């Protein structure tokens, strides 16, 4: 299964607001569970991961955002900045790391803050 950064962002937004974004309805249970487990593994959320008999993550109980989770969400919250990140960093055919995405989001937020 693949990491879905759009879903990661939606899950973080949901955790912060306690409201389910309507876009979450398009995801199946397996995809939701896997990406929720990734949030815990990445240290963006405190929680516990459930694994199948092969040790693959299949779900997670998400408790609350961590400091790092709040920081990432603060960078990714603005729809304009997120759209730019999807166009430049997350577009198909380009390899990226989470660190690269987070740095791009921080730089775009910094530019917006400084009016550059």
Predicted stretch roles:
Residues 31-45:
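Basic amphipathic alpha-helical segments that dock to polyanions
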Residues 3, 7, 11, 31, ...:
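Residue-level detector of well-ordered alpha-helical segments, enriched
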Residues 76-116:
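Exposed, interaction-prone assembly regions rather than primary DNA-binding/catalytic cores
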Residues 1-23:
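Short amphipathic alpha-helical interface segments
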Residues 56-89:
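Short, amphipathic alpha-helical interaction segments positioned at domain boundaries
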Residues 48-50, 54:
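Beta-hairpin "wing" of winged helix-turn-helix
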